[in-house]
């Protein structure tokens, strides 16, 4: 017990240093209200000022600008073209055709880019929404039963759930838990409704029994996972519930805590980290455990240094066993030994699959998740046309793809015809392309150091050429991911080849992840150009083609061959 008291003393005292300014901001925000309403009325600037720049994140938005034209606007003595990106809250990524048509219409009429972006957080984003349209955006979403509460900021964000329409009953159970967890951990403040939906201003204390008056030290991510699929990448998340079934019925979850991929260039105290397995809990204790993990991180997390504020660093600082014991105490539960499970795949099953209920599901590969009408490939229009006739729902995936789910047999041919006519089914897409992914990066992300989404398609074509040069069959491909900065949205730190942006045209080159997403890769080359990277890939793939063991993946080969050392304990090994 004294150890726990000591931990609390350290974490609530001054030993970690003075509080970060974000803590003042949250404390003074009037429960996330700030002066956002006043900023909305200010037409002199297209942006949000002072603290509101940060506070709008708790409402699901980031202030951005078009970096392609930033310098030109500066020459003309104009401020950057400020706009916001909104990320919707959609636990499990399920959206109805009616909802889809509404967001498609808004993107077309009220965003600068006219696109919808599916993201690794299993939801959609609007990019390029100007200040006069922000309130309309929230009201449009509210009218169709969607919001963006807590999809950014120091809160529990959009809860992911394995997209597995084949095992329909189990998926439905898991999805319902994803929704319950999301609702349970949401902020209780009425600020969102008051500001965006003209909700009645109530005299209320806005008590936050789980998140607390200062909310969490840093962002917090949660998943619900149905083995053997790991499409949500459990080790990228703070809290994971691994579904354990008995005779097809969900009986409980194995709980994994403390994953996360973000780091800071040049700071060896930051690193990607896998989640720790705490053990099994029955269904009835799920919400208590979720709240206990969140409140322990709330109370023990580092509020002095935001670079070390995530759950993964709390576990490494206080000890995983100490953190686990506190969760047990708060939840009133004893973790049982984890039930057996295996994660073997994480790609989406592109094409048609039939569920156990006889319904059909069409997974569409959407490169980098960008739905736009390209010349000869009107992808965005194609999905809208499907939505006009589809009787089931759509499921966004954490791989940035889209599943047309619940298609009856008699409608299958018609849906496929629409998809093919609009380029949504393209038989020329290689398995390598389907297993490659990038975050948004330029021109909209203010944190991007290098290109990602715009860089990936042509670079994948070059990787395809390398694989062909070394006579590798289609099924022998590489999990390849690019992220424009070390914050990790593209989940490159769980790839067999992961590129992390360092500067325009330059990346840190990581090797050694595996196909199932259960190993963190290690830096192989630092700050090199894309041409140098391609040369290295050519050499490494050449070796893999000749020297590999039977069925040995590229990432496994790089470890066995000693090209990079395996990262077993991130704090010790990642920077070693």
Swiss-Prot record:
The UniProt record lists the EC number as 1.8.1.2
One term of GO molecular function = sulfite reductase (NADPH) activity
Q: Which residues does the annotation say bind siroheme?
A: 489
Q: Which GO terms describe its cellular component?
A: sulfite reductase complex (NADPH)
Reaction it catalyzes = hydrogen sulfide + 3 NADP(+) + 3 H2O = sulfite + 3 NADPH + 4 H(+)
Give the residues the record marks as binding [4Fe-4S] cluster: 439, 445, 485, 489
Co-factor remark: Binds 1 siroheme per subunit. Binds 1 [4Fe-4S] cluster per subunit.
Q: Where are the transmembrane segments?
A: none
GO biological process: any one? cysteine biosynthetic process
Any single Pfam family the record assigns to this protein: NIR_SIR
Q: In which pathway does it act?
A: Sulfur metabolism; hydrogen sulfide biosynthesis; hydrogen sulfide from sulfite (NADPH route): step 1/1
Keyword annotations for this protein, in alphabetical order, are: 4Fe-4S, Amino-acid biosynthesis, Cysteine biosynthesis, Heme, Iron, Iron-sulfur, Metal-binding, NADP, Oxidoreductase
Cofactor (UniProt): siroheme; [4Fe-4S] cluster
Q: Which InterPro entries match?
A: CysI, NiRdtase/SiRdtase_haem-b_fer, Nit/Sulf_reduc_fer-like_dom_sf, NO2/SO3_Rdtase_4Fe4S_dom, NO2/SO3_Rdtase_4Fe4S_prot, NO2/SO3_Rdtase_4Fe4S_sf, NO2/SO3_Rdtase_FeS/sirohaem_BS
Q: What does this protein do?
A: Component of the sulfite reductase complex that catalyzes the 6-electron reduction of sulfite to sulfide. This is one of several activities required for the biosynthesis of L-cysteine from sulfate.
UniProt record similarity statement: Belongs to the nitrite and sulfite reductase 4Fe-4S domain family.
Matches recorded under NCBIfam families: CysI, PRK13504.1
Q: What is this protein called?
A: Sulfite reductase [NADPH] hemoprotein beta-component
Organism, by scientific name, is Aliivibrio fischeri (strain MJ11) (Vibrio fischeri)
The major lineage groups are: Bacteria, Pseudomonadati, Pseudomonadota, Gammaproteobacteria, Vibrionales
Q: Which gene encodes it?
A: cysI
């Amino acid at each position: 017990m004294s150890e726990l008291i000591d931990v609390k003393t350290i974490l609530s005292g001054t030993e970690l240093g003075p509080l970060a300014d974000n803590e003042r901001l949250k404390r003074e925000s009037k429960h996330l209200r700030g002066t956002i309403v006043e900023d909305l009325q200010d037409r002199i600037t297209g942006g949000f000022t002072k603290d509101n720049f940060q506070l709008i994140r708790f409402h699901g938005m980031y202030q951005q600008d078009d970096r392609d034209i930033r310098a030109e606007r500066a020459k003309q003595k104009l401020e950057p073209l400020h706009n916001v990106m909104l990320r919707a809250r959609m636990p499990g990524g399920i959206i109805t055709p009616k909802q889809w048509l509404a967001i498609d219409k808004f993107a077309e009429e009220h965003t600068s880019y006219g696109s919808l972006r599916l993201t690794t957080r299993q939801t959609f984003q609007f990019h390029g929404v100007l200040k006069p349209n922000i309130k309309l955006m929230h009201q449009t979403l509210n009218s169709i039963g969607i919001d963006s509460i807590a999809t950014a900021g120091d809160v529990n964000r959009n809860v992911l759930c394995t997209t597995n329409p084949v095992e329909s009953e189990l998926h439905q159970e898991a999805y319902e838990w994803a929704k319950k967890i999301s609702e349970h951990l949401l902020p209780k403040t009425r600020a969102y409704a008051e500001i965006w939906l003209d909700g009645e201003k109530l005299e209320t204390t806005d008590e936050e029994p789980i998140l607390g008056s200062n909310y969490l030290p840093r962002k917090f991510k949660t998943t619900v996972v149905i083995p053997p699929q790991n499409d949500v990448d459990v080790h990228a998340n703070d809290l994971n519930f691994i579904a354990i079934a008995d005779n097809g019925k969900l009986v409980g979850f194995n709980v994994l805590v403390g994953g996360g991929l973000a780091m800071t260039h040049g700071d060896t105290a930051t690193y990607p980290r896998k989640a720790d397995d705490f053990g099994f809990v029955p269904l009835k204790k799920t919400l208590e455990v979720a709240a206990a993990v969140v409140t322990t991180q709330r109370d023990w997390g580092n509020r002095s240094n935001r670079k070390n504020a995530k759950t993964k660093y709390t576990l490494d600082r206080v000890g995983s066993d100490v953190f686990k014991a506190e969760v047990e105490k708060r939840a009133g539960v004893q973790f049982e030994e984890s039930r057996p499970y295996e994660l073997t795949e994480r790609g989406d099953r592109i094409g048609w699959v039939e569920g156990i209920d006889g319904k059909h599901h069409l997974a569409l590969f959407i490169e980098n998740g960008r739905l736009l009408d390209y010349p000869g490939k009107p992808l965005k229009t194609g999905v809208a046309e499907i939505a006009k006739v589809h009787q089931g729902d759509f499921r966004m995936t954490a791989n940035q793809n889209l599943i047309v789910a619940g298609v009856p047999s008699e409608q299958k041919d018609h849906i496929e015809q629409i998809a093919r006519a609009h380029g949504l089914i393209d038989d020329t897409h290689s398995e390598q392309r389907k297993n490659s992914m990038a975050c948004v990066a330029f021109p909209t992300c203010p944190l991007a150091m290098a290109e990602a989404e715009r860089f990936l398609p042509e670079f994948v074509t070059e990787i395809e050429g390398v694989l062909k040069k070394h006579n590798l069959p289609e099924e022998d491909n590489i999990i390849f991911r690019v992220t424009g900065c070390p914050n990790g949205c593209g989940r490159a730190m769980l790839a067999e080849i992961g590129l992390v942006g360092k500067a325009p045209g330059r990346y840190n080159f990581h090797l050694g992840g595996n196909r199932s997403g259960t190993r963190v890769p290690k830096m192989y080359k630092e700050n090199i150009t894309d041409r140098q990277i391609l040369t290295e890939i050519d050499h490494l793939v050449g070796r893999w083609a000749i020297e590999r063991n039977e069925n040995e993946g590229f990432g496994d080969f790089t470890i066995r061959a000693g090209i990079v050392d395996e990262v077993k304990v991130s704090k010790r090994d990642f920077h070693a």
